[in-house]
Amino acid sequence: MKVRAITLGCKVNTYESEYILSCFKDKGYEITNDIADIYIVNTCSVTNMSDAKSRKVIHRLVRENKNSVIVVMGCMIEANKDIKLDGVSIIIGNKDKAKVVELVEAYLKDREQKRLLYENFDSTFEDMFITNMESRHRAFVKIEDGCENFCSYCIIPYTRGRVRSKNPDTVIKEITTLVKNGYKEVVLTGIHTGHYGSDIETSFPELLKEIVKIEGLERLRISSIEITELNDEFLNVLKNNSVIVSHLHIPLQAGSDKILTLMNRKYLTPYFLDKVEKIREIRPDISLTTDVIVGFPKETEEDFLDTINFCKKIKFTKIHVFPYSRRKGTKADLMDEQIPENIKKERVKRLIDVSNNLEKEYLDSFISKTVSVLIEENKDGYSIGHTGNYLKVKILGDIKANEIVSVKIKERENLELVGEYEKDK
Protein backbone atom coordinates (compact mmCIF):
# COMPACT_ATOMS: atom_id res chain seq x y z
CA MET A 1 0.00 0.00 0.00
CA LYS A 2 1.13 3.56 -0.75
CA VAL A 3 1.43 6.22 1.97
CA ARG A 4 1.59 9.98 1.56
CA ALA A 5 2.17 12.62 4.24
CA ILE A 6 0.83 16.16 3.91
CA THR A 7 2.53 18.42 6.44
CA LEU A 8 1.40 21.91 7.40
CA GLY A 9 3.14 24.31 9.74
CA CYS A 10 6.43 24.12 11.58
CA LYS A 11 9.67 22.16 11.32
CA VAL A 12 8.58 20.03 14.28
CA ASN A 13 5.66 18.80 12.18
CA THR A 14 8.07 18.12 9.31
CA TYR A 15 10.25 15.99 11.58
CA GLU A 16 7.26 14.10 12.99
CA SER A 17 5.90 13.37 9.51
CA GLU A 18 9.31 12.07 8.43
CA TYR A 19 9.38 9.79 11.46
CA ILE A 20 5.89 8.46 10.71
CA LEU A 21 6.81 7.77 7.07
CA SER A 22 9.93 5.92 8.21
CA CYS A 23 7.75 3.71 10.43
CA PHE A 24 5.51 2.85 7.46
CA LYS A 25 8.57 2.20 5.28
CA ASP A 26 9.99 -0.20 7.89
CA LYS A 27 6.71 -2.14 7.72
CA GLY A 28 6.94 -2.53 3.95
CA TYR A 29 4.66 0.30 2.83
CA GLU A 30 5.61 2.42 -0.20
CA ILE A 31 6.12 6.16 0.31
CA THR A 32 4.74 8.43 -2.41
CA ASN A 33 4.05 12.08 -3.22
CA ASP A 34 1.22 11.07 -5.55
CA ILE A 35 -2.12 9.27 -5.20
CA ALA A 36 -2.02 7.04 -2.11
CA ASP A 37 -3.97 4.41 -0.21
CA ILE A 38 -3.17 6.08 3.12
CA TYR A 39 -2.95 9.84 3.71
CA ILE A 40 -1.39 11.36 6.82
CA VAL A 41 -2.35 15.01 7.44
CA ASN A 42 -0.22 16.70 10.10
CA THR A 43 -2.12 19.91 10.85
CA CYS A 44 -1.20 23.38 12.09
CA SER A 45 -3.24 25.78 14.20
CA VAL A 46 -0.85 28.61 15.02
CA THR A 47 -3.19 31.12 13.31
CA ASN A 48 -6.79 31.08 12.12
CA MET A 49 -5.47 31.00 8.56
CA SER A 50 -3.35 27.89 9.20
CA ASP A 51 -6.32 26.28 10.94
CA ALA A 52 -8.52 27.01 7.92
CA LYS A 53 -5.84 25.72 5.53
CA SER A 54 -5.66 22.44 7.46
CA ARG A 55 -9.45 22.03 7.23
CA LYS A 56 -9.38 22.78 3.50
CA VAL A 57 -6.76 20.08 2.86
CA ILE A 58 -8.76 17.54 4.88
CA HIS A 59 -12.05 18.26 3.09
CA ARG A 60 -10.36 18.00 -0.32
CA LEU A 61 -8.77 14.65 0.54
CA VAL A 62 -12.07 13.25 1.83
CA ARG A 63 -13.88 14.43 -1.29
CA GLU A 64 -11.31 13.07 -3.75
CA ASN A 65 -10.24 9.84 -1.98
CA LYS A 66 -13.35 8.10 -0.69
CA ASN A 67 -11.69 4.66 -0.54
CA SER A 68 -8.44 5.80 1.10
CA VAL A 69 -7.48 5.71 4.76
CA ILE A 70 -7.18 9.31 5.99
CA VAL A 71 -5.36 10.09 9.24
CA VAL A 72 -5.66 13.60 10.68
CA MET A 73 -3.45 14.65 13.57
CA GLY A 74 -1.75 17.56 15.25
CA CYS A 75 -2.41 21.03 16.61
CA MET A 76 -5.61 21.76 14.70
CA ILE A 77 -7.18 18.70 16.33
CA GLU A 78 -5.87 19.64 19.79
CA ALA A 79 -7.36 23.13 19.38
CA ASN A 80 -10.72 21.74 18.22
CA LYS A 81 -11.21 18.52 20.20
CA ASP A 82 -14.95 18.33 19.42
CA ILE A 83 -14.44 18.63 15.66
CA LYS A 84 -16.57 16.37 13.45
CA LEU A 85 -14.66 15.02 10.45
CA ASP A 86 -16.85 12.76 8.33
CA GLY A 87 -14.84 10.53 6.02
CA VAL A 88 -11.71 10.67 8.19
CA SER A 89 -10.50 7.28 9.40
CA ILE A 90 -8.29 8.21 12.37
CA ILE A 91 -8.26 11.39 14.47
CA ILE A 92 -5.46 12.02 16.99
CA GLY A 93 -3.84 15.05 18.56
CA ASN A 94 -0.13 15.42 19.25
CA LYS A 95 0.18 12.60 21.78
CA ASP A 96 0.02 9.37 19.76
CA LYS A 97 1.88 10.25 16.56
CA ALA A 98 4.37 7.45 17.20
CA LYS A 99 1.49 4.93 17.08
CA VAL A 100 0.10 5.83 13.66
CA VAL A 101 1.11 2.60 11.87
CA GLU A 102 -0.46 0.55 14.66
CA LEU A 103 -3.67 2.61 14.47
CA VAL A 104 -3.87 2.35 10.67
CA GLU A 105 -3.44 -1.42 10.75
CA ALA A 106 -6.17 -1.70 13.40
CA TYR A 107 -8.46 0.44 11.22
CA LEU A 108 -7.80 -1.73 8.16
CA LYS A 109 -9.14 -4.71 10.12
CA ASP A 110 -12.44 -3.26 11.34
CA ARG A 111 -12.92 -0.02 9.30
CA GLU A 112 -14.17 1.79 12.42
CA GLN A 113 -13.11 5.40 13.00
CA LYS A 114 -10.40 5.73 15.66
CA ARG A 115 -10.43 8.86 17.81
CA LEU A 116 -7.70 9.28 20.45
CA LEU A 117 -7.76 12.60 22.29
CA TYR A 118 -6.76 13.39 25.88
CA GLU A 119 -7.21 16.19 28.38
CA ASN A 120 -3.55 16.12 29.44
CA PHE A 121 -0.17 15.45 27.84
CA ASP A 122 2.33 12.92 29.15
CA SER A 123 5.13 14.39 31.26
CA THR A 124 7.79 12.62 29.19
CA PHE A 125 8.97 13.07 25.59
CA GLU A 126 7.34 10.80 23.00
CA ASP A 127 10.50 9.28 21.56
CA MET A 128 11.04 9.50 17.83
CA PHE A 129 14.26 8.64 16.01
CA ILE A 130 15.01 9.07 12.31
CA THR A 131 17.96 7.90 10.21
CA ASN A 132 17.06 9.62 6.91
CA MET A 133 14.74 12.29 5.52
CA GLU A 134 12.91 12.02 2.22
CA SER A 135 14.38 14.37 -0.43
CA ARG A 136 16.26 16.70 1.91
CA HIS A 137 19.90 17.73 2.18
CA ARG A 138 19.69 18.94 5.76
CA ALA A 139 18.23 16.82 8.52
CA PHE A 140 15.84 17.99 11.22
CA VAL A 141 16.13 16.55 14.72
CA LYS A 142 13.33 17.20 17.19
CA ILE A 143 14.86 17.61 20.64
CA GLU A 144 11.94 19.09 22.59
CA ASP A 145 8.16 19.47 22.64
CA GLY A 146 5.85 21.86 24.46
CA CYS A 147 5.91 25.47 25.62
CA GLU A 148 5.21 27.19 28.94
CA ASN A 149 5.53 30.85 27.91
CA PHE A 150 1.79 31.47 27.48
CA CYS A 151 2.10 34.53 25.26
CA SER A 152 -1.31 36.20 25.25
CA TYR A 153 -1.91 35.61 21.52
CA CYS A 154 -0.74 31.99 21.29
CA ILE A 155 -2.69 28.72 21.40
CA ILE A 156 0.39 26.45 21.19
CA PRO A 157 0.91 25.80 24.95
CA TYR A 158 -2.60 24.35 24.91
CA THR A 159 -2.05 22.21 21.80
CA ARG A 160 1.47 21.00 22.65
CA GLY A 161 1.55 20.87 26.44
CA ARG A 162 4.42 21.51 28.83
CA VAL A 163 8.12 21.27 27.95
CA ARG A 164 9.34 17.70 27.43
CA SER A 165 12.93 17.01 26.38
CA LYS A 166 14.44 14.13 24.43
CA ASN A 167 17.11 12.15 26.29
CA PRO A 168 20.49 13.76 25.43
CA ASP A 169 22.08 10.38 24.67
CA THR A 170 19.29 9.71 22.15
CA VAL A 171 19.87 13.11 20.52
CA ILE A 172 23.60 12.39 20.14
CA LYS A 173 22.94 8.91 18.75
CA GLU A 174 20.37 10.24 16.26
CA ILE A 175 22.61 13.02 14.94
CA THR A 176 25.60 10.65 14.76
CA THR A 177 23.51 8.24 12.66
CA LEU A 178 22.33 11.03 10.34
CA VAL A 179 25.91 12.24 9.81
CA LYS A 180 27.04 8.69 9.02
CA ASN A 181 24.21 8.54 6.49
CA GLY A 182 25.62 11.56 4.65
CA TYR A 183 23.94 14.61 6.17
CA LYS A 184 26.31 17.54 6.49
CA GLU A 185 23.85 19.89 8.19
CA VAL A 186 21.53 19.18 11.10
CA VAL A 187 18.77 21.52 12.29
CA LEU A 188 17.68 21.28 15.93
CA THR A 189 13.93 21.77 16.21
CA GLY A 190 11.40 22.04 19.00
CA ILE A 191 8.35 24.02 20.00
CA HIS A 192 10.52 25.97 22.46
CA THR A 193 14.00 24.73 21.57
CA GLY A 194 15.94 26.87 24.03
CA HIS A 195 14.00 25.42 26.97
CA TYR A 196 15.48 22.01 26.22
CA GLY A 197 16.53 20.24 29.40
CA SER A 198 14.49 22.28 31.88
CA ASP A 199 12.52 19.13 32.76
CA ILE A 200 15.46 16.68 32.91
CA GLU A 201 18.13 18.59 34.84
CA THR A 202 20.30 19.64 31.92
CA SER A 203 20.30 22.62 29.55
CA PHE A 204 20.36 23.56 25.88
CA PRO A 205 23.99 24.83 26.03
CA GLU A 206 25.05 21.55 27.68
CA LEU A 207 23.46 19.61 24.82
CA LEU A 208 25.16 21.84 22.23
CA LYS A 209 28.56 21.18 23.83
CA GLU A 210 28.08 17.46 23.21
CA ILE A 211 26.62 17.77 19.71
CA VAL A 212 29.52 19.85 18.36
CA LYS A 213 31.89 16.98 19.25
CA ILE A 214 30.21 14.65 16.73
CA GLU A 215 32.76 13.71 14.08
CA GLY A 216 31.74 14.61 10.53
CA LEU A 217 29.04 17.14 11.46
CA GLU A 218 29.83 20.22 9.38
CA ARG A 219 26.91 22.49 10.22
CA LEU A 220 24.61 22.74 13.22
CA ARG A 221 21.61 25.03 12.90
CA ILE A 222 19.10 26.06 15.57
CA SER A 223 15.62 26.47 14.11
CA SER A 224 14.55 29.19 16.55
CA ILE A 225 15.53 30.50 19.98
CA GLU A 226 14.09 33.13 22.32
CA ILE A 227 16.20 36.15 23.24
CA THR A 228 15.82 35.27 26.95
CA GLU A 229 17.67 31.99 26.33
CA LEU A 230 20.82 33.66 25.00
CA ASN A 231 22.56 33.48 28.36
CA ASP A 232 26.31 33.66 28.94
CA GLU A 233 26.67 29.88 28.72
CA PHE A 234 24.96 29.80 25.32
CA LEU A 235 27.00 32.75 24.04
CA ASN A 236 30.20 31.04 25.15
CA VAL A 237 29.27 27.87 23.22
CA LEU A 238 28.48 30.00 20.16
CA LYS A 239 31.80 31.82 20.46
CA ASN A 240 33.92 28.66 20.65
CA ASN A 241 32.24 26.37 18.12
CA SER A 242 32.25 27.34 14.45
CA VAL A 243 30.18 24.27 13.54
CA ILE A 244 27.19 26.24 14.88
CA VAL A 245 26.24 28.37 11.87
CA SER A 246 26.14 32.16 11.89
CA HIS A 247 22.38 32.36 11.75
CA LEU A 248 19.89 32.70 14.59
CA HIS A 249 16.15 33.08 14.27
CA ILE A 250 15.04 35.11 17.29
CA PRO A 251 11.33 36.02 17.45
CA LEU A 252 10.83 39.69 18.36
CA GLN A 253 7.01 39.90 17.82
CA ALA A 254 6.92 43.67 18.49
CA GLY A 255 9.30 46.61 18.81
CA SER A 256 7.00 48.51 21.16
CA ASP A 257 7.41 47.90 24.89
CA LYS A 258 3.70 48.54 25.42
CA ILE A 259 2.76 45.82 22.93
CA LEU A 260 5.41 43.39 24.23
CA THR A 261 3.88 43.73 27.70
CA LEU A 262 0.36 43.13 26.35
CA MET A 263 1.68 40.08 24.50
CA ASN A 264 3.13 38.70 27.77
CA ARG A 265 6.56 38.43 26.22
CA LYS A 266 9.37 38.04 28.76
CA TYR A 267 11.54 41.03 27.75
CA LEU A 268 11.47 44.64 26.62
CA THR A 269 13.37 46.24 23.74
CA PRO A 270 16.46 47.41 25.74
CA TYR A 271 17.06 43.81 26.86
CA PHE A 272 16.65 42.53 23.29
CA LEU A 273 19.09 45.13 21.94
CA ASP A 274 21.68 44.35 24.63
CA LYS A 275 21.62 40.63 23.78
CA VAL A 276 21.94 41.32 20.05
CA GLU A 277 24.97 43.52 20.66
CA LYS A 278 26.60 40.69 22.64
CA ILE A 279 25.90 38.23 19.80
CA ARG A 280 27.47 40.57 17.24
CA GLU A 281 30.58 40.97 19.39
CA ILE A 282 31.05 37.21 18.94
CA ARG A 283 29.83 36.87 15.34
CA PRO A 284 29.97 40.25 13.54
CA ASP A 285 28.54 38.88 10.26
CA ILE A 286 25.77 36.78 11.84
CA SER A 287 22.38 36.69 10.13
CA LEU A 288 19.54 37.47 12.53
CA THR A 289 16.03 36.73 11.32
CA THR A 290 12.83 37.27 13.25
CA ASP A 291 9.04 37.07 13.48
CA VAL A 292 6.87 40.13 14.02
CA ILE A 293 3.11 40.31 14.61
CA VAL A 294 1.45 43.53 13.43
CA GLY A 295 -2.02 44.77 14.23
CA PHE A 296 -2.05 43.40 17.77
CA PRO A 297 -4.93 44.76 19.91
CA LYS A 298 -4.33 48.37 21.02
CA GLU A 299 -1.42 48.82 18.57
CA THR A 300 -1.43 52.49 17.56
CA GLU A 301 0.40 53.99 14.59
CA GLU A 302 3.03 55.21 17.06
CA ASP A 303 3.46 51.67 18.42
CA PHE A 304 3.85 50.34 14.89
CA LEU A 305 6.44 52.99 14.06
CA ASP A 306 8.34 51.93 17.20
CA THR A 307 8.44 48.41 15.75
CA ILE A 308 9.67 49.64 12.36
CA ASN A 309 12.39 51.77 13.94
CA PHE A 310 13.51 49.01 16.29
CA CYS A 311 13.76 46.50 13.43
CA LYS A 312 15.92 48.97 11.53
CA LYS A 313 18.07 49.50 14.63
CA ILE A 314 18.63 45.76 15.07
CA LYS A 315 19.24 45.36 11.31
CA PHE A 316 17.51 42.02 10.96
CA THR A 317 18.42 40.10 7.83
CA LYS A 318 14.80 39.12 7.28
CA ILE A 319 11.51 39.78 9.07
CA HIS A 320 8.71 37.23 8.81
CA VAL A 321 5.65 39.45 9.14
CA PHE A 322 2.29 38.14 10.36
CA PRO A 323 -0.99 40.01 10.81
CA TYR A 324 -2.38 39.37 14.29
CA SER A 325 -4.84 36.47 14.18
CA ARG A 326 -7.44 36.08 16.93
CA ARG A 327 -7.36 32.64 18.57
CA LYS A 328 -10.26 31.55 20.74
CA GLY A 329 -9.04 30.57 24.21
CA THR A 330 -6.24 33.14 24.37
CA LYS A 331 -6.15 36.34 26.45
CA ALA A 332 -5.57 38.54 23.41
CA ASP A 333 -8.84 37.36 21.86
CA LEU A 334 -10.70 39.06 24.73
CA MET A 335 -8.80 42.36 24.53
CA ASP A 336 -10.50 45.61 23.55
CA GLU A 337 -9.41 47.78 20.61
CA GLN A 338 -9.00 45.02 18.03
CA ILE A 339 -7.38 46.42 14.89
CA PRO A 340 -9.36 46.47 11.60
CA GLU A 341 -8.17 44.06 8.90
CA ASN A 342 -7.41 46.82 6.37
CA ILE A 343 -5.00 48.47 8.82
CA LYS A 344 -3.32 45.12 9.53
CA LYS A 345 -2.81 44.52 5.80
CA GLU A 346 -1.35 47.98 5.29
CA ARG A 347 1.06 47.52 8.19
CA VAL A 348 2.12 44.09 6.94
CA LYS A 349 3.03 45.60 3.58
CA ARG A 350 5.00 48.44 5.15
CA LEU A 351 7.03 46.13 7.36
CA ILE A 352 7.71 43.70 4.50
CA ASP A 353 9.13 46.65 2.55
CA VAL A 354 11.42 47.39 5.50
CA SER A 355 12.43 43.72 5.62
CA ASN A 356 13.26 43.62 1.91
CA ASN A 357 15.47 46.70 2.18
CA LEU A 358 17.31 45.28 5.21
CA GLU A 359 17.80 41.95 3.45
CA LYS A 360 19.20 43.60 0.31
CA GLU A 361 21.62 45.62 2.43
CA TYR A 362 22.85 42.46 4.18
CA LEU A 363 23.16 40.51 0.93
CA ASP A 364 25.14 43.31 -0.71
CA SER A 365 27.72 43.07 2.09
CA PHE A 366 28.74 39.65 0.72
CA ILE A 367 29.48 40.74 -2.86
CA SER A 368 33.14 39.91 -3.72
CA LYS A 369 33.42 37.64 -0.65
CA THR A 370 33.95 33.87 -0.71
CA VAL A 371 31.32 31.83 1.14
CA SER A 372 30.60 28.13 1.76
CA VAL A 373 27.41 26.84 0.14
CA LEU A 374 25.58 23.57 0.77
CA ILE A 375 24.29 22.53 -2.67
CA GLU A 376 20.66 21.39 -2.50
CA GLU A 377 19.39 21.25 -6.08
CA ASN A 378 20.23 21.75 -9.76
CA LYS A 379 17.73 23.81 -11.72
CA ASP A 380 17.75 25.67 -15.05
CA GLY A 381 21.50 25.31 -15.45
CA TYR A 382 22.27 26.51 -11.93
CA SER A 383 23.32 24.79 -8.72
CA ILE A 384 21.36 26.24 -5.80
CA GLY A 385 22.04 26.11 -2.08
CA HIS A 386 22.42 28.05 1.15
CA THR A 387 25.30 29.51 3.11
CA GLY A 388 25.74 28.87 6.81
CA ASN A 389 23.96 32.13 7.54
CA TYR A 390 21.10 30.90 5.34
CA LEU A 391 21.56 33.08 2.29
CA LYS A 392 20.31 31.56 -0.95
CA VAL A 393 23.04 31.34 -3.58
CA LYS A 394 22.91 30.13 -7.18
CA ILE A 395 25.99 29.10 -9.16
CA LEU A 396 26.14 28.56 -12.92
CA GLY A 397 26.76 24.90 -13.76
CA ASP A 398 25.98 21.54 -12.19
CA ILE A 399 27.57 20.78 -8.84
CA LYS A 400 26.77 17.56 -7.01
CA ALA A 401 23.99 17.96 -4.44
CA ASN A 402 24.86 17.63 -0.75
CA GLU A 403 28.36 19.03 -1.30
CA ILE A 404 29.63 22.08 0.59
CA VAL A 405 31.63 24.19 -1.85
CA SER A 406 33.45 27.54 -1.89
CA VAL A 407 31.69 30.21 -3.93
CA LYS A 408 32.78 33.76 -4.72
CA ILE A 409 29.76 36.08 -4.72
CA LYS A 410 29.55 38.18 -7.87
CA GLU A 411 26.21 39.98 -7.61
CA ARG A 412 22.76 40.13 -6.07
CA GLU A 413 19.62 39.38 -8.08
CA ASN A 414 16.75 40.77 -6.01
CA LEU A 415 16.88 38.63 -2.81
CA GLU A 416 19.31 35.99 -4.10
CA LEU A 417 23.07 35.95 -4.45
CA VAL A 418 24.83 34.79 -7.62
CA GLY A 419 28.30 33.34 -7.32
CA GLU A 420 31.12 31.51 -9.06
CA TYR A 421 32.35 28.08 -7.96
CA GLU A 422 35.96 28.23 -6.72
CA LYS A 423 37.13 24.68 -7.47
CA ASP A 424 40.55 24.98 -5.87
CA LYS A 425 39.26 26.02 -2.42
Regions found by a protein language model. Give the residues of each.
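Proteins enriched for Cys/Gly/acidic motifs involved in redox and nucleic-acid/cofactor modification
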Residues: 1-194, 233, 248, 270-281, ...
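Short, solvent-exposed loop/turn segments at secondary-structure boundaries
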Residues: 50-52, 162-169, 197-202, 262-265, ...
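Conserved SAM/AdoMet-binding glycine-rich loop
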Residues: 70-71, 79-82, 180-301
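Short flexible coil/turn linkers enriched for glycine and charged/polar residues
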Residues: 134-137, 147-148, 244, 254, ...
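Conserved, mostly hydrophobic/aromatic
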Residues: 151, 171, 188, 222, ...
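Contiguous mid-protein beta-loop-alpha structural module that forms a pocket-lining wall or clamp
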Residues: 299, 315-316
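Short glycine-rich, low-complexity segments
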Residues: 317, 330-334
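Terminal RNA-binding accessory module
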Residues: 334-425
